[in-house]
Amino acid sequence: MDPQIASASVLAAALAIGLAAIGPGIGQGNASGQAVEGIARQPEAEGKIRGTLLLTLAFMESLTIYGLVIALVLLFANPFAG
């Protein structure tokens, strides 16, 4: 494999996982904070808020997993390697 392609693939993999983790990380923090505030205001709605929170956290985490998959493809099954 060409050294430039190898180094670009490693850099792209690092950027893919890094950038894929930033957005969901911020979103999960905001969602969790809002859920805690909602439970503090309405303790009787705790079950519904928690269920909705867990579902949305799973959706947000899937974005990070997609970034991880792209990074692994670039590192181990590189389509640009020739």
Curated annotation (Swiss-Prot):
TM ranges: 5-25, 57-77
Pfam hit, one: ATP-synt_C
Q: CDD domains attached here? A: ATP-synt_Fo_c_ATPH
> GO CC annotation: what is one?
plasma membrane-derived thylakoid membrane
Q: Name one GO molecular function term.
A: lipid binding
Q: Which residues are marked as site: Reversibly protonated during proton transport?
A: E61
Q: How does it sit in the membrane?
A: Multi-pass membrane protein
What keywords does the record list, in alphabetical order? ATP synthesis, CF(0), Hydrogen ion transport, Ion transport, Lipid-binding, Membrane, Thylakoid, Transmembrane, Transmembrane helix, Transport
Q: Which InterPro entries match?
A: ATP_synth_csu_bac/chlpt (IPR005953), ATP_synth_F0_csu (IPR000454), ATP_synth_F0_csu_DDCD_BS (IPR020537), ATP_synth_F0_csu_sf (IPR038662), ATPase_proteolipid_c-like_dom (IPR002379), F/V-ATP_Csub_sf (IPR035921)
Q: Which domain of life is it from?
A: Bacteria
Localization per Swiss-Prot or TrEMBL = Cellular thylakoid membrane
Function, as annotated: F(1)F(0) ATP synthase produces ATP from ADP in the presence of a proton or sodium gradient. F-type ATPases consist of two structural domains, F(1) containing the extramembraneous catalytic core and F(0) containing the membrane proton channel, linked together by a central stalk and a peripheral stalk. During catalysis, ATP synthesis in the catalytic domain of F(1) is coupled via a rotary mechanism of the central stalk subunits to proton translocation. Key component of the F(0) channel; it plays a direct role in translocation across the membrane. A homomeric c-ring of between 10-14 subunits forms the central stalk rotor element with the F(1) delta and epsilon subunits.
Which family does the record claim for this protein? Belongs to the ATPase C chain family.
**Subunit annotation:** F-type ATPases have 2 components, F(1) - the catalytic core - and F(0) - the membrane proton channel. F(1) has five subunits: alpha(3), beta(3), gamma(1), delta(1), epsilon(1). F(0) has four main subunits: a(1), b(1), b'(1) and c(10-14). The alpha and beta chains form an alternating ring which encloses part of the gamma chain. F(1) is attached to F(0) by a central stalk formed by the gamma and epsilon chains, while a peripheral stalk is formed by the delta, b and b' chains.
Q: What is this protein called?
A: ATP synthase subunit c
What organism does the record attribute this protein to?
Answer: Cyanothece sp. (strain PCC 7425 / ATCC 29141)
Question: What is the gene name?
Answer: atpE
